[in-house]
């Protein structure tokens, strides 16, 4: 093939180039560049081509590299990714024949590398036959060559030729292009060392020779703009002019293109039509392109040597890329848009190449059988095209061809309007992105629709990729919609064969009606979506044709698969029928819409289609038209919904593929539906469809993704429709339909690949979403009542729709969630769907037919799903149950309410849903790290839910109760992120509701831990029944996670409620302790089960175990304190542990250091239940804590914490949270020790100002062309998140958090824990120890504990922000070296030992005298001593961004050193005693003699420093450290319930090189450790300097329960309160269980002689203390 890649005009040419470029990279890259390079000078382009010609052997990448620099500035893409224009080498004879782009595309076959060379040649011939498009392509190629030649004669023409050459995919192709230019020599000139004089070079130009490569070229010193002007340009042959104009940005060639299409259509010379705009060659962009090209030429960039070098570098870089990331993310910055478009088009072309024979044949009936437009739909999604080409080529291609044909038809109709040109531009961009190149292609032949269709069909077979792109480009520019109508019919008849002919006929009918603004009738037929779009567009105006072409083309790309698919599906009759029926259904809905608002629908359709495409591409919002912009932002807002929706879309696709009958009934019923209702349904579908497009792109692995595109197109028609009044009701129907179809399909998929496949797809979707800013909007929408409404909207869509597009988006998300859930649980889904349909129909009250159709579909889907779901349900019962929480967390609150009905469906969906939602939750975790990031927004989108996931266990139960009780009862507090994103919605709920929710959570976890759950259920079954009432237990399970996701948390005045609850909690603490032991036993059982489970199941089970723990904790909370309300916190899945300032330092910040401990994330609430019922009623618990603390204060010195407890209600002010670990260290007034400078105000050597760094990164990213991708990777410092999460600070309860600690261990998100007591954090950390799948995959304990992340989530899902990944400082301590992380991975066990030392409540902690002593010492020490331990912990807190804005980069990479408090490398060696003293004033204060224990001071010191952080941190550590540690951490969690938050909990996190990651937690300072949350992954002991005071009674009860729980949980987990870290000699009893490695032999430190466990000591045989030195 001949490829001309304009150097400067790459962006312009890239549009065509994309179509021509077969390589995926080339596809994406050229598109951006085309768009970016607005004014690339054609001559420059030619020059690049010439240079490329010399580098014939060079890879197209190299050519791209050459061209990139000018385009980079314009497109912000790397040079090596410049788009290429592949011009088929048309002999001079052919050149006039093939002026159209299609010809150029078809001529692309020249490169032998392409598989379809022969096909392309055939296509070229076909293109000749269909001279219009082919002529345009040939003209482009010829124009480039002619320009090059003309320029060759004069240096100016040569400049042009290199530009065209730049697009060459291969040197040979470029040679052909240049060789085709008369008198232009492409022969590689002998490179002589002699430098030709200017005169000599000018003389050579007469022979057609010009140097386009070396810096010696005369062009390097020539003013290109003097050469490239209208006068010289007019000297070129018309064909050359036309082709060169194609390289210019659309703005500079619109007028000419409008005329050109007619000429192309007529096949006449395009010269007559070619008229450059006044400023096309005289503008800053063109001038810059000329200058850049000259600079690159003078720099020697185009020399063969440099080209080869650039090529190798590009290949080397590409080889470094992770295939998964390469699939879902642009490999290079700035490459996303252009390359995404190119890839989409190219991939679609690749698929179309397979389909091309059929598609081409389409215009020519023979090809119809091979039509596989599905690939076009797949094409819509970049990722799908890339990776699914091989897997989905058959299915996709079959569908794609139809889509192409339909697109051609629909696009053909619309081209008539003048708007068509404008819309075409937008569509071009949009379509390029969504790789709806077929649609654009269809439109591309601006001359006549007939030609367009033929060209498209021809191009698809010849070079589906290449031809597609040029067609799209041309189609967009060309607006000859009127002519298109008739030709469309002809083309359609050829291409469509049976179905397509019908479609075309329908389209023809539509086209006329469209023109006449009566497109409804035709649309319902096979091309429903495209037709609908076109019809709507036509209805608005005849110009709507342009809109239709723009909107219809996207719709065609996305939706076309349905209608054309019947034809294309001929090979796949089932799929074809299904898609056709589905399309018909959609069409009917769209059809109905069109009558309602012709103008509105047209506008809406256009916006929707573009939006859908954008969605599938996940690239540009800007391309949307005005309506699109208004609505698309909302949809983008629901981009998160697209995550879920993506799954839904996938399901829809598969459903449409598999269940033919259900889609058809939908179609019939829909057609009957009223236009208004259909509009609404379309509107509903549109957001879901956009998500579907996303899903298809993300889940291209799923064969059904093509179907998703159709869904998108149909819904695309109505995205604006929801704005119309009738839209609401209809939207629900559309959503239901989409959900049903999606469910049916997804269920099948899930059966095939129940967990991993979906999770991978989900991950892809999620990451795509991360790239989108839309999620942010969605999250805000999802938060608060809107979220509920949205969930209801999924069911009761109508109510919310009128409220706002945001609601629609959320509705779509909910629907997607529902669909996901439906997929997973077909049986449950049946009920859910029926209910949804019923609710929707009732609420809509628009059309009973719609509801009936939906019901029919639902029934069929239910039947189909029931079969699949039954299988999946039995197979994945435990996993699903585990996943249920995560899924529910993703479900909106309204959905959770509705989840009462839908619960089982959601549960069944849990596995696939969990995969998808896990992605979201992982995203959420990332979000928690950086709420500002788009990824954070994404998680918020689908997840306010995901945020809630952490809270899920506790909140989920609460929300179902709330839902059951009434929305009115719920009082919402919406947390807003620093970005203004809604972090979460907090519902003020009575403890009873919370308890009920907890029961629900427990119920959900039953499958994972049947016995434990059964007991819990028995305990709370009545409450659950009350809550559930009408809802099934499964729905309850769903509801619980949903409620948790909703982040329903109460912020009650801690002072009032806390005192009341304090007594109750104290009384109940004993019960909780008893329960805790039983629960711990259950947890152990669950943990073992999790360990045994498969890796993915392990993750799910681990989540389930965490949920169980949470539920148990919640139960304990309920039992302990049935206080009116629990403090609910939106637990962002932030893995970041925020350290709260010592209560003394900033009571508000400490918010109750003790209370903080009690405040976990979602889990924190659960923990609160266990630790002190106070959390259940956060305000009460905080006061209770205060009361207890006051009592303790009487007993102890820590009165400070009482104030913080009261303050706990307040979120930590940004200033309140210590911005740096150093600050935290400074806060502890206690002397840390001899060697420590922790008290100094100076920051530690590795300290990083996270907030400032984050701001800098934000600014850099904002200015980066790759901002979409980068935003997802940037995670806000936990301090920022905490500051903006008042709920997190809510210090729900309380110091009693001993229970809190337990639940926290299960799954308290670190970020939430930050506010919550350290015990909460510890619980979170501990929860995931056994999720072995991949410790990374667990995504940090926070996520797992939250259960927000599906076990199946690959570690990559978290992306950079994932806590498990050290790239991100976020949840994991960046200080933690990856090496260590790797080391940790091997270690499956992370033991968090909680030394229960009720400091303030020491008197109460009679159960354990040591704990009491420790607590007394702690209280004596006051929070400050705790803080000192924290200071040591800060090093470990490095990873915890939560409270400190400064992250300490861990300096010591020694495995053992991780647990030690950071020490200057120059610090003198410390004796064990010294180390204890220094690191743990708490230990000595707590009465735990560090040195006396006989263990290396480093071990105890670690614990000591951890004391402040106490259990919460340790649990958190375990979680973050290793998801696999979860079980142990869970075990620890219950020990953590050490009642005394006030007592500094010593958390010693030890990274054992041997592999088991052991987190040592001394529970002595639980209260002070409120802030001391530690990510397990951090290995850092985070001790908060919260006052050790804690309610004495809770402390006593907690310590008792904890030890019991510890014993039950694990011998290792059993921590003697005082003896956890004590050396074996000191406490014989405790020693065995104290250390995670206590079972291992003791080794003497080579340096200080301290006894250390073999696992605790590194290879150097040095204790932690010595290692630090």
UniProtKB/Swiss-Prot annotation:
UniProt keyword annotation of Plastid present: no
Molecular function terms, GO-annotated: chromatin binding; deubiquitinase activator activity; DNA binding; zinc ion binding
Domain (DEUBAD) ranges: 215-338
Low complexity composition-biased segments: 635-650, 666-718, 1174-1192, 1404-1436, 1592-1610
Motif (LXXLL motif 1): 224-228
Positions with biased composition (Basic and acidic residues): 336-352, 465-474, 651-661
Biological-process GO terms, alphabetical: animal organ morphogenesis; antennal development; anterior/posterior axis specification; apposition of dorsal and ventral imaginal disc-derived wing surfaces; cell fate determination; epigenetic regulation of gene expression; negative regulation of DNA-templated transcription; positive regulation of DNA-templated transcription
Region ranges (Disordered): 90-109, 336-378, 410-478, 635-718, 952-972, 1174-1193, 1398-1437, 1482-1505, 1587-1610
CC terms in the record's Gene Ontology section: chromatin; nucleus; PR-DUB complex
Key words of the record: Chromatin regulator, Chromosome, Developmental protein, Metal-binding, Nucleus, Repeat, Repressor, Transcription, Transcription regulation, Zinc, Zinc-finger
Composition-biased stretches (Polar residues): 367-378, 413-425, 434-450
Role played: Non-catalytic component of the polycomb repressive deubiquitinase (PR-DUB) complex, a complex that specifically mediates deubiquitination of histone H2A monoubiquitinated at 'Lys-119' (H2AK118ub1). Activator of the PR-DUB complex involved in ubiquitin binding and allosteric activation of calypso deubiquitinase activity. PR-DUB does not deubiquitinate monoubiquitinated histone H2B. PR-DUB is required to maintain the transcriptionally repressive state of homeotic genes throughout development. The PR-DUB complex has weak or no activity toward 'Lys-48'- and 'Lys-63'-linked polyubiquitin chains.
Family per similarity comment: Belongs to the Asx family.
PANTHER family linked to this entry: ADDITIONAL SEX COMBS LIKE PROTEIN ASXL, POLYCOMB PROTEIN ASX
Domain notes from UniProt: The DEUBAD domain is involved in modulation of the ubiquitin C-terminal hydrolase activity of caly/calypso. It contains two Leu-Xaa-Xaa-Leu-Leu (LXXLL) motifs involved in the interaction with caly/calypso. It also contains an Asn-Glu-Phe (NEF) motif involved in stabilizing the association of the PR-DUB complex with ubiquitin to promote deubiquitinase activity.
Protein name from the UniProt record: Polycomb group protein Asx
Organism of derivation: Drosophila melanogaster (Fruit fly)
């Amino acid at each position: 093939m001949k490829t001309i890649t304009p150097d400067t005009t790459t962006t312009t040419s890239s549009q065509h180039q994309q179509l021509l470029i077969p390589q995926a990279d080339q596809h994406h890259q050229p598109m951006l560049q085309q768009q970016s390079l607005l004014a690339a000078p054609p001559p420059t382009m030619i020059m690049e081509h010439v240079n490329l010609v010399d580098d014939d052997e060079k890879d197209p990448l190299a050519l791209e590299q050459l061209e990139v620099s000018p385009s980079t500035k314009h497109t912000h893409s790397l040079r090596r990714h410049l788009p290429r224009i592949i011009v088929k080498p048309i002999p001079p004879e052919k050149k006039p024949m093939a002026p159209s782009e299609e010809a150029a595309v078809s001529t692309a076959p020249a490169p032998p590398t392409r598989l379809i060379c022969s096909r392309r040649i055939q296509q070229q011939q076909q293109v000749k036959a269909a001279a219009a498009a082919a002529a345009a392509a040939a003209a482009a190629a010829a124009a480039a060559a002619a320009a090059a030649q003309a320029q060759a004669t004069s240096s100016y023409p040569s400049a042009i030729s290199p530009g065209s050459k730049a697009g060459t995919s291969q040197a040979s192709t470029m040679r052909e292009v240049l060789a085709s230019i008369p008198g232009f020599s492409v022969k590689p000139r002998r490179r002589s060392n002699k430098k030709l004089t200017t005169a000599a070079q000018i003389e050579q130009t007469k022979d057609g020779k010009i140097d386009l490569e070396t810096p010696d070229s005369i062009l390097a010193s020539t003013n290109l703009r003097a050469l490239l002007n209208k006068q010289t340009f007019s000297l070129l042959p018309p064909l050359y002019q036309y082709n060169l104009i194609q390289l210019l940005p659309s703005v500079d060639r619109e007028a000419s293109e409008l005329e050109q299409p007619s000429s192309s259509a007529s096949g006449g010379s395009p010269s007559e039509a070619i008229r450059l705009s006044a400023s096309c060659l005289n503008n800053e962009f063109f001038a810059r392109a000329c200058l850049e090209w000259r600079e690159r030429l003078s720099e020697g960039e185009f020399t063969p040597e440099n080209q080869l070098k650039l090529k190798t570098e590009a290949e080397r870089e590409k080889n470094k890329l992770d295939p998964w990331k390469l699939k879902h993310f642009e490999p290079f910055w700035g490459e996303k848009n252009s390359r995404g478009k190119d890839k989409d088009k190219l991939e679609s072309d690749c698929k179309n190449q397979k389909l091309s024979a059929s598609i081409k044949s389409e215009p020519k009936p023979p090809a119809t059988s091979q039509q596989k437009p599905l690939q076009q739909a797949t094409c819509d999604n970049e990722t799908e095209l890339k990776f699914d080409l091989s897997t989905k080529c058959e299915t996709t291609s079959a569908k794609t061809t139809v889509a192409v044909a339909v697109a051609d038809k629909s696009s053909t109709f619309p081209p008539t309007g003048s708007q068509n040109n404008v819309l075409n531009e937008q569509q071009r961009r949009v379509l390029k992105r969504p790789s709806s190149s077929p649609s654009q292609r269809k439109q591309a032949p601006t001359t006549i629709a007939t030609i367009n269709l033929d060209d498209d069909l021809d191009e698809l077979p010849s070079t589906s990729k290449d031809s597609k792109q040029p067609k799209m480009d041309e189609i967009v520019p060309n607006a000859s919609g009127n002519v298109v109508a008739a030709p469309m019919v002809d083309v359609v008849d050829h291409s469509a064969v049976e179905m397509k002919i019908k479609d075309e006929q329908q389209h023809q009918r539509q086209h006329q009606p469209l023109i006449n603004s009566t497109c409804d009738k035709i649309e319902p037929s096979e091309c429903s979506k495209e037709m609908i779009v076109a019809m709507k567009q036509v209805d608005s105006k005849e110009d709507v044709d342009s809109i239709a072409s723009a909107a219809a083309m996207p719709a065609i790309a996305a939706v076309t698969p349905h209608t054309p698919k019947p034809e294309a599906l001929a090979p796949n009759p089932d799929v074809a029928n299904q898609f056709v029926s589905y399309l018909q259904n959609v069409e009917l809905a769209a059809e109905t819409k069109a009558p309602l608002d012709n103008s509105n629908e047209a506008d809406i359709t256009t916006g929707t289609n573009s939006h859908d495409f954008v969605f599938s591409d996940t690239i540009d919002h800007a391309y949307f038209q005005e309506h699109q912009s208004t609505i698309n932002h909302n949809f983008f807002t629901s981009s998160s919904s697209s995550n879920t929706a993506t799954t839904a879309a996938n399901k829809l696709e598969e459903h449409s593929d598999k269940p033919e009958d259900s889609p058809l009934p939908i179609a019939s019923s829909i057609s009957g539906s009223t236009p208004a209702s259909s509009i609404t349904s379309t509107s509903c579908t549109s957001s879901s469809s956009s998500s579907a497009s996303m899903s298809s792109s993300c889940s291209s692995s799923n064969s059904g993704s093509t179907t998703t595109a159709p869904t998108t197109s149909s819904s695309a028609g109505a995205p604006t429709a929801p704005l119309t009044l009738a839209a609401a009701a209809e939207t629900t129907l559309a959503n239901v339909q989409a959900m049903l179809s999606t469910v049916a399909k997804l269920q099948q998929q899930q059966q095939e690949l129940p967990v991993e496949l979906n999770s991978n797809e989900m991950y892809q979707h999620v990451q795509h979403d991360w790239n989108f800013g839309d999620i942010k909007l969605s999250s805000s929408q999802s938060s608060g009542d809107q979220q509920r409404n949205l969930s209801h909207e999924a069911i009761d869509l109508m109510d919310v729709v009128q409220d706002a597009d945001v609601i629609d988006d959320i509705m779509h998300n909910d629907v997607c969630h529902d669909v996901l859930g439906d997929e997973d649980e077909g049986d449950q889904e049946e009920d859910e769907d029926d209910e949804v349909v019923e609710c929707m129909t009732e609420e809509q009250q628009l059309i009973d037919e719609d509801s009936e159709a939906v019901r029919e579909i639902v029934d069929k889907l239910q039947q189909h799903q029931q079969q699949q779901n039954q299988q999946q349900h039995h197979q994945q019962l435990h996993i699903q149950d585990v996943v249920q929480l995560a899924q529910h967390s993703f479900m909106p609150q309204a959905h959770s309410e509705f989840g009462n009905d839908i619960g089982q469906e959601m549960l069944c969906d849990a596995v696939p849903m969990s995969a998808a939602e896990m992605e979201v939750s992982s995203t959420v975790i990332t979000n928690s790290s950086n709420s500002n990031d788009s990824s954070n927004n994404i998680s918020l989108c689908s997840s306010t839910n995901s945020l809630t996931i952490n809270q899920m266990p506790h909140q989920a139960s609460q929300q179902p109760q709330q839902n059951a009780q009434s929305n009115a009862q719920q009082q919402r507090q919406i947390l807003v992120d620093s970005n203004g994103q809604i972090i979460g919605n907090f519902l003020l709920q009575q403890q009873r509701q919370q308890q009920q929710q907890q029961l629900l959570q427990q119920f959900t976890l039953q499958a994972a831990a049947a016995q434990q759950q059964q007991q819990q259920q028995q305990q709370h079954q009545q409450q659950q029944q009350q809550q559930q009432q009408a809802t099934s237990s499964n729905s309850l399970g769903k509801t619980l996670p949903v409620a948790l996701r909703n982040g329903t948390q109460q912020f009650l005045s801690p002072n009032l409620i806390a005192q009341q609850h304090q007594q109750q909690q104290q009384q109940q603490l004993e019960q909780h302790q008893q329960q805790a032991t039983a629960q711990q036993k259950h947890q152990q059982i669950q943990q073992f089960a999790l360990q045994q489970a498969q890796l993915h199941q392990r993750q799910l089970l681990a989540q389930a175990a965490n949920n169980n723990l949470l539920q148990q904790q919640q139960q304990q909370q309920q039992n302990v304190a049935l206080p009116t309300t629990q403090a609910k916190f939106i637990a962002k899945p932030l893995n970041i542990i925020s350290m709260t300032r010592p209560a003394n330092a900033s009571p508000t910040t400490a918010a109750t250091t003790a209370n903080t401990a009690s405040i976990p994330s979602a889990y924190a609430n659960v923990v609160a239940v266990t630790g002190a019922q106070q959390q259940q009623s956060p305000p009460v618990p905080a006061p209770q804590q205060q009361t207890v603390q006051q009592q303790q204060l009487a007993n102890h010195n820590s009165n400070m914490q009482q104030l913080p407890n009261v303050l706990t209600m307040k979120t930590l002010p940004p200033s309140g949270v210590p911005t740096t670990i150093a600050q935290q260290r400074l806060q502890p007034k206690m002397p840390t020790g001899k060697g420590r400078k922790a008290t100094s105000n100076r920051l530690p050597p590795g300290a990083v100002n996270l907030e400032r760094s984050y701001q800098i990164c934000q600014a850099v990213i904002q200015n980066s062309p790759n901002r979409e991708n980068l935003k997802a990777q940037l995670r806000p410092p936990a301090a920022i998140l905490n500051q903006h999460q008042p709920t997190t600070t809510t210090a729900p309860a309380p110091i009693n958090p001993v229970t809190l600690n337990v639940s926290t261990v299960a799954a308290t998100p670190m970020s939430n824990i930050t506010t919550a007591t350290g015990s909460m954090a510890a619980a979170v950390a501990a929860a995931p120890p056994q999720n072995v799948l991949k410790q990374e995959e667990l995504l940090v304990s926070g996520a797992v504990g939250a259960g927000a992340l599906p076990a199946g989530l690959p570690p990559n899902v978290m992306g950079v922000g994932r806590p498990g990944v050290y790239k991100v400082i976020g949840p994991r301590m960046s200080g933690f070296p990856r090496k260590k992380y790797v080391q940790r991975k091997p270690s499956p066990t992370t033991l968090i030992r909680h030394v229960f030392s009720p400091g303030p409540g020491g008197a109460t902690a009679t159960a354990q005298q040591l704990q009491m002593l420790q607590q007394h010492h702690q209280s004596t020490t006051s929070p400050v001593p705790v803080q000192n331990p924290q200071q040591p912990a800060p090093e470990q807190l490095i990873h915890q961004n939560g409270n400190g804005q400064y992250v300490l980069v861990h300096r010591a990479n020694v495995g053992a050193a991780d647990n030690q408090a950071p020490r200057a490398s120059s610090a003198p060696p410390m004796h064990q005693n010294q180390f204890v003293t220094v690191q743990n004033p708490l230990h000595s204060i707590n009465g735990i003699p560090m040195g006396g224990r006989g263990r290396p001071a480093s071990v105890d010191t670690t614990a000591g420093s951890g004391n402040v952080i106490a259990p919460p941190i340790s649990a958190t550590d375990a979680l973050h450290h290793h998801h696999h540690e979860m079980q142990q951490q869970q075990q620890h969690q219950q020990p953590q319930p050490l009642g005394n938050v006030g007592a500094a909990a010593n958390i010693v996190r030890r990274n054992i090189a041997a592999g088991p990651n052991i987190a040592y937690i001394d529970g002595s300072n639980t209260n002070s450790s409120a802030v001391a949350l530690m990510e397990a992954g951090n290995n850092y002991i985070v001790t908060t300097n919260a006052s050790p005071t804690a309610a004495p009674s809770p402390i006593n009860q907690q310590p008792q329960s904890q030890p019991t729980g510890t014993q039950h949980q694990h011998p290792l987990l059993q921590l003697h309160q005082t003896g956890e870290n004590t050396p074996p000699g000191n406490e014989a009893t405790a020693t065995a269980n104290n250390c995670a490695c206590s079972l291992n032999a003791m080794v003497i430190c080579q340096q200080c002689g301290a006894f250390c466990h073999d696992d605790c000591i590194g290879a150097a045989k040095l204790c932690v203390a010595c290692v630090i030195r």
